[in-house]
């Protein structure tokens, strides 16, 4: 079955096709633990703060009491600051079983406070989405473009024809790198970390926060 495609590299696969057993599958989508939720923004959400609720444990993805719906039109823009540097490997987008499900996702890296006007620029990667009602379809990023990310913007630009868009879950898979205390600016954070200077974690819900 076709799972959609991406422009500029990457693709889509079932989470069930991943090598780890089902009980371990949710551990891979632990980057939500590394989001600075207090600073996360969702533009054009109909209910203030609802966009934060879709970044949750993979095991809770089917909880439909938490969702975000767009307001004025079908577009949503998530501005996602991380607490360190991230190597983003894959994304899951779960929606409703109707035309409100997102049909296109555009990714931008390291543009804090991004606005809808900023989405006129070329995205780092664009995906055509299939309907995913169970949180099983992963869209693989082009890792060479997303290996040094401190801020991610997800632009839901289209749905399948409804007036508004609904999203129930966004899963992020990848690795998180701790920033050193004396790092002056994240922008200068080297792409190839020296293991002696940094600790790299495959993020899982069991990982402790570094304060």
From Swiss-Prot:
Pfam families: PITH
Coiled coil stretches, renumbered: none
Keyword annotations from UniProtKB, A to Z: Activator, Cytoplasm, Phosphoprotein, Transcription, Transcription regulation
Induction: Up-regulated in K562 and HEL cells undergoing megakaryocyte differentiation induced by phorbol myristate acetate (PMA).
Tissue specificity annotation: Down-regulated in primary acute myeloid leukemia (AML) patients.
Main localization of the protein described in the UniProt heading: cytoplasm
Phosphotyrosine: modified positions: 189
Localization of this protein: Cytoplasm
Residue span, PITH domain: 20-192
SUPFAM superfamilies, per the entry: Galactose-binding domain-like
Keyword Mitochondrion: no
Single GO biological process annotation from the record: positive regulation of DNA-templated transcription
Signal peptide: none
Cross-referenced InterPro entries: Galactose-bd-like_sf (IPR008979), PITH1-like (IPR045099), PITH_dom (IPR010400), PITH_dom_sf (IPR037047)
Biological function: Promotes megakaryocyte differentiation by up-regulating RUNX1 expression. Regulates RUNX1 expression by activating the proximal promoter of the RUNX1 gene and by enhancing the translation activity of an internal ribosome entry site (IRES) element in the RUNX1 gene.
Family the UniProt entry places it in: Belongs to the PITHD1 family.
Protein name: PITH domain-containing protein 1
Gene encoding the protein: PITHD1
């Amino acid at each position: 079955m076709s799972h959609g495609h991406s422009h500029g590299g990457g693709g889509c696969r079932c989470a069930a096709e991943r090598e780890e057993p089902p009980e371990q599958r949710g551990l891979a989508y632990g980057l939500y633990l590394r989001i600075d939720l207090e600073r996360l923004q969702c533009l054009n959400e109909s209910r203030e703060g609802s966009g934060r609720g879709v970044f949750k444990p993979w095991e809770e993805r089917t909880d439909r009491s938490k969702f975000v719906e767009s307001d004025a039109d079908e577009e949503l823009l998530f501005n996602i600051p991380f607490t360190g540097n991230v190597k983003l490997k894959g994304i899951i987008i779960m929606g409703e079983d109707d035309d409100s499900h997102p049909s296109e996702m555009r990714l931008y890296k390291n543009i804090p406070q991004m606005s809808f006007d900023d989405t006129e620029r070329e995205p780092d990667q664009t995906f055509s989405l299939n309907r995913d009602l169970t949180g099983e379809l992963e869209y693989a990023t082009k890792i060479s473009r997303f290996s040094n990310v401190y801020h991610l913007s997800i632009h839901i630009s289209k749905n399948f024809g409804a007036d508004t868009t609904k999203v129930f879950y966004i899963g992020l898979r990848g690795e998180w790198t701790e920033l050193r205390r004396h790092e002056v600016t994240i922008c200068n954070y080297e792409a190839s970390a020296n293991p002696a200077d940094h600790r790299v974690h495959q993020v899982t819900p069991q990982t402790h926060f570094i304060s």
